[in-house]
Amino acid sequence: FPYQGSSIILESGNVNDYEVVYPRKVTALPKGAVQQKYEDAMQYEFKVNGEPVVLHLEKNKGLFSKDYSEIHYSPDGRRITTHPLVEDHCYYRGHIRNDADSTASISACNGLKGHFKLRGETYLIEPMKISNSEAHAVYKYENVEKEDEAHKMCGVTQNWESYEPIKKASQLIVSTEFQKYMEIVIVVDHSMYTKHKGDSDKIKAWVYEMINTISESYRYLYIDIIVSALEMWSEKDLINVETSAENTLKSFGEWRAKDLIHRISHDNAQLLTATDFDGPTIGLAYVASMCDPKRSVGVVQDHSSVNHLVAITLAHEIAHNLGVHHDKSSCSCGSGYTCIMSPVINSEVIKYFSDCSYIQCREYISKENPPCILNKPLRTDTVSTPVSGNELLEAGKDYD
């Protein structure tokens, strides 16, 4: 990169080696087309390592449910529910033109922010805080100074040594009947609300970026992830959030069954917290529990300033709910890649579920037939690309 040795503080942390780029929009709208604030498809051109690339983006139209709501609380404890218009949102997925293996998950709300894969390397992009400038920083994730080199793990401890897959992934026939739809509620607890200084717009952007990232991973499991609601415990926690991930998970599941499930239509709920769970644990979820009122839940620690790392922890925990276990060494998601269901989170950028996860998810769905994910919900846009999903287990600083 041109600025080797330079250091800059960006949202992901201190970056030692970055490139300044000026993305140029190259999309031409068809004649007579109505100009949306955020088009359905966009292309941007910029240089990476001196070479021009074209980033092709398509809006993630299935991101929000038709009756999407946001909930927060007034100082006197009243619940305030709004139904914001989210049709014209700014969350995209895509690829680099002429690179068959490339992927991208980008928010275009204020400049381009997110990550893309180019020639096997993962890059992050974000706007630079320079007034009246289109300057963006592009950098490899490996050049972000890591906050904490300690291993982080999922708290789920079930093993599947006795598990012998009946079929290889290549033998599973995939048809449209395999497509499933998971409506999810994200609950942000008071510690996370406070960590982000009570800035609800910032919190929403942080959460939406995560869901946009994991929806891409779940496409390969033929599961659509759709956000039904975002609830922020803006005044105080509605459960006792403890440093014990196990106790917090139990309390959250009980609260969902007695409260949340009666006021918001959804299939699964995940709690995001800034509470530092005991030991290396950064997440926890029940295994094979999708659609159960108390157990279709997970808890995830907001453990990194890199959005992608927290997103993958969220994806991991949801997959446990879908009957997916931690990967063994024989599981693979491509040469040299760490997979989402690795029990330990290291400092690599992870994007894919393994062949084992795919088989376990499909077999769980075919055997258990969890009813809540069979219906195709109304969305802000009925056109949607298949998204795959696995169940996730607890996520922790280490995945046990």
Curated annotation (Swiss-Prot):
- Protein name, UniProt field: Snake venom metalloproteinase H3
**Record's keyword annotation contains Aminoacyl-tRNA synthetase:** no
Which positions bind Ca(2+) 1?
A: E183, D267, C372, N375
How the cofactor is bound: the record states: Binds 1 zinc ion per subunit.
Sorted keywords for this record are: Calcium, Disulfide bond, Hemostasis impairing toxin, Hydrolase, Metal-binding, Metalloprotease, Protease, Secreted, Signal, Toxin, Zinc, Zymogen
Q: Does the keyword Signal apply?
A: yes
Q: Which residues form the propeptide?
A: 7-176, 378-400
UniProt subcellular location = Secreted
For this protein, the Enzyme Commission number is: 3.4.24.-
Q: Which CDD domains match?
A: ZnMc_adamalysin_II_like
What is its biological role? Snake venom metalloproteinase that impairs hemostasis in the envenomed animal.
Looking at the record, the residues that make up the Peptidase M12B domain are 180-377
Broad class of enzyme this protein falls into? hydrolase
Organism encoding this protein: Deinagkistrodon acutus (Hundred-pace snake)
Q: Which GO terms describe its biological process?
A: proteolysis
Cystine links in this protein are C291-C372, C331-C356, C333-C339
The Gene Ontology terms for molecular function here are: metal ion binding; metalloendopeptidase activity; toxin activity
Gene Ontology CC: extracellular region; plasma membrane
Question: Which Pfam families does this entry report, sorted A to Z?
Answer: Pep_M12B_propep, Reprolysin
Q: What family does this belong to?
A: Belongs to the venom metalloproteinase (M12B) family. P-I subfamily.
Task: Kindly state the tissue distribution recorded for this protein.
Answer: Expressed by the venom gland.
Q: How does it assemble?
A: Monomer.
Chief subcellular location equals secreted
